[in-house]
Amino acid sequence: MQGSRFKTAMTNSPFSTIACILTLPAYQRKGYGKFLIEFSYELSKIEKKVGSPEKPLSDLGQLSYGSYWSEILLNVLIGSGKEHLSIFDLCSITSFKADDTIQTLQKLNLLKYYSGNYLIYITDEAREKHKKYQARKKHQKRVDPTKIHWTPYESGRKRDPWLIASKIRGLLDQDEDS
């Protein structure tokens, strides 16, 4: 086994998809970390949850997750062919938490404020970045969701992982004030 995905039942956040990724030194820089990140989000999709890694992230964790979030969001925004997608739509499709989605869109410089609303605007730079991701994709280890046999754990309490609309507005308002 080259890497491991750990998720404990005792994590402090019900939206934490993963607590720790370990890739042994001999297998680092070979795509196993990103593979494990993708695997954790595929499990979140099966469970119909949004999630995020346990925070704070290490420097390497920030780089790995930031790269993964950027790649997937650009794939959805550019590759889906849909003209109108909201933050809620992106969270539903990717299983990313709203704050991770918004933060990544900001880092990619894709959020624009216009007439009292935020719009997702695809720049030429983002299209170029998407082309680079597509070129690298041929050599990456990918998760095939059809090969995952997983039965989600059902706890006694019910949570609504999609309760994000008010959080999205709050996050966007915070950025506007800064």
Feature-to-residue mapping (PLM):
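Extended, composition-driven regions rather than compact fold-specific motifs
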Residues: M1-K30, F35-S178
